Amino acid sequence: MASRNIWCVRRNFLFDLRGWMLQYSAEVFLKSISFRTFSVECDSKDKESLEEEREDLLSNLVTMGVDIDMARRRQPGVFNKAVTNEQELKIFLLSKGASDKVIGSIISRYPRAITRTPESLSKRWDLWRKIMASDLEIVNILERSPESFFRSNNNLNLENNIKFLCSVGLTHKCLCRLLTNAPRTFSNSLNLNKQMVEFLQETGMSLGHNDPRDFVRKIISKNPSILIQSTKRVKTNIEFLQSTFNLNKQDLLLLICGPGARILDLSNDCTKKNYTNIRERLLSLGCSEEEVQRFVLSYLNMVFLSEKKFNDKIDCLIEEKISASQIIENPRILDSSINTLKTRIRELSHAGYDLSTSSIALLSWSQRRYEAKLKRLCG
């Protein structure tokens, strides 16, 4: 009898426990449904709010003359930002003298500009003004290269770069050239600029230059873009010049402090490919190895000419009975476009000027000087 009572007590307890658990589970389940419904409602409201903000952003950008398709292609992530400052950016740039058209162009090409705060922009502008003479000069740089100003909002890094470049002896004029022609220099990390400067100083010393700081100034003044290249690229180009032209240290030093500085930042593959083409083309015309090297060293800008451009210009001159030896003695004529060469050759021929026996240097003269000469020839 006692055992049956105990069994009944256990059974009632278990039924009560199961009922309590079912009730508790139902409450939890209903609460979770209620919470989920609330969450969905919140997500829906947030989504609607975000969509409204995006519509406002697009409307603002269209009103500002921004090319939306271009901006999306370049930096699509900007359109997903929760906060943007396009109106503040417009007001800021207008206050600096930028036109509506320029502002639209800047944002179209570098949309991330609208994520910068007015405070950050103002600080960065003040730092640039320490180098540039006027707001308009900065606006012109932004119009040409918006990335240079808006790429980074690390104003401390910019300030440190300016201090460092001044410390290695760069003049205010040189800093202006850097900011105008290679503004990305100031967006580099400070360590990156230090690495290049240290590399150039070591290179100058290894070639016998007695003032490493002066060597750095000369290279940067000749080639402002060098600080945005890798030390590996510059080193490879220096080695190429030395080995290709069999230069001793003194001659190599003179070359890279002068005309050779301009090709130090050229792609290594491009340098070798273009030189190989020049060499093979001139050898095919009967020039000697010595003449080829003299030709290139006398005007290293030749290395910037692509294979097609160089060959087309040579063909144009050869077709007009101008000899390879004349070209070797006047490398600067290859600076002129093919259209200019053809036009001048035709005009000189009509004026009775025989290019096959006379100087061809006037093919590379300035337009004003050339026209004065042509007028005298025509009498």
Curated annotation (Swiss-Prot):
Annotated site location: Interaction with DNA: 144, 184, 332
Region of interest (Interaction with DNA), residue spans: 151-152, 229-233, 306-313, 337-340, 366-373
Family the UniProt entry places it in: Belongs to the mTERF family.
Functional summary from the UniProt entry: Transcription termination factor. Binds to a 28 bp region within the tRNA(Leu(uur)) gene at a position immediately adjacent to and downstream of the 16S rRNA gene; this region comprises a tridecamer sequence critical for directing accurate termination. Binds DNA along the major grove and promotes DNA bending and partial unwinding. Promotes base flipping. Transcription termination activity appears to be polarized with highest specificity for transcripts initiated on the light strand.
Cell compartments where the protein resides: Mitochondrion
Keyword Mitochondrion appears in the UniProt entry: yes
Presequence positions on this chain: 1-37
GO biological process: DNA-templated transcription termination; regulation of DNA-templated transcription; transcription initiation at mitochondrial promoter
PTM field: Phosphoprotein with mostly four phosphate groups. While the DNA-binding activity is unaffected by the phosphorylation state, only the phosphorylated form of the protein is active for termination activity. Functioning seems to be regulated by phosphorylation.
Loss of function: phenotype: Double knockout of Mterf1a and Mterf1b results in viable animals with no gross phenotype, and normal oxidative phosphorylation capacity. Steady-state mitochondrial DNA levels are normal. There are subtle effects on levels of mitochondrial transcripts: transcripts initiated at the light strand promoter and also situated downstream of the MTERF binding site are increased, levels of 7S RNA are reduced, while levels of other mitochondrial transcripts appear normal.
GO MF annotations in UniProt: double-stranded DNA binding; sequence-specific DNA binding
Organism for this UniProt entry: Mus musculus (Mouse)
Gene name tied to this protein: Mterf1b
Keywords carried by this UniProt record: DNA-binding, Mitochondrion, Phosphoprotein, Repeat, Transcription, Transcription regulation, Transcription termination, Transit peptide
Swiss-Prot/TrEMBL domain comment: Contains nine structural repeats of about 35 residues, where each repeat contains three helices. The repeats form a left-handed superhelical assembly with a solenoid structure that wraps itself around DNA.
GO cellular component, as recorded: mitochondrion
Main location: mitochondrion
Subunit details: Monomer.
Free-text tissue specificity from the UniProt record: Expressed strongly in the heart and at lower levels in brain, liver and kidney.
InterPro entries per UniProt: MTERF, MTERF_sf
Protein name from the UniProt record: Transcription termination factor 1b, mitochondrial
